[in-house]
UniProtKB/Swiss-Prot annotation:
One of its GO terms (cellular component) is membrane. Residues 1-22 form the signal peptide. Keywords: Membrane, Signal, Transmembrane, Transmembrane helix. This is Putative uncharacterized membrane protein YEL018C-A. It is a multi-pass membrane protein.
Length: 177
């Protein structure tokens, strides 16, 4: 299966109300459902949450959790987050997006990349910038030619912890299948 892959490096504030770029919806406080009790944690979260709050987790807990609130634009996705004690290890997020959202996603890929550069250069928060980007949605109406025959967007987000305690450095791979 052929596809187009876009790689983005983004600095994501750990804000529980930060709207997701792909789905355009906000996230309620996570509700975690523990299943096991071992020395690491795996968490499933809705794509509306591109953040993690370490205070939710105990040092020796393993849990699989999910946010039940659906995205307003019906963007099915899940995230797998691996913790070891209190240390954040990695997160992989997989999203499937309906094809009619591709015009938004394509330009948001570029906007997220630019915003990440601004954040890294000037150490500013993305919360206000996120609101500005969301107001640009009405002008994102023209799909790129290479997306016209596509039906799904596959996003794989891999996050690693950075030096600050309130943000995550993430690597997003967008595959248009």
């Amino acid at each position: 299966m052929c596809g187009v892959v876009v790689v983005i490096v983004a600095l994501v504030p750990a804000d529980p109300l930060l709207p997701a770029f792909a789905c355009g919806c906000s996230c309620d406080a996570p509700v975690f459902i523990p299943f096991f009790n071992i020395s690491s944690s795996i968490i499933l979260i809705c794509s509306t949450c591109v953040f993690l709050n370490r205070s939710y987790f105990s040092s020796r807990s393993f849990s699989i959790s999910c946010i039940s609130k659906p995205c307003r634009l019906s963007c099915p996705s899940f995230s797998v987050v691996l913790y070891s004690g209190n240390k954040f290890l990695t997160m992989v997020r997989i999203s499937l997006m309906p094809s009619f959202l591709f015009p938004f996603a394509t330009l948001l890929c570029l906007l997220k990349f630019v915003s990440s550069l601004i954040s890294k250069l000037f150490c500013i928060s993305l919360v206000n910038l996120t609101s500005d980007i969301r107001r640009l949605f009405p002008i994102m109406l023209i799909p790129p030619p290479f997306l016209t025959s596509s039906s799904f967007l596959l996003e794989i987000k891999v996050c690693i912890s950075c030096n600050t305690t309130n943000s995550l450095t993430s690597l997003s791979i967008y595959a248009f299948l």
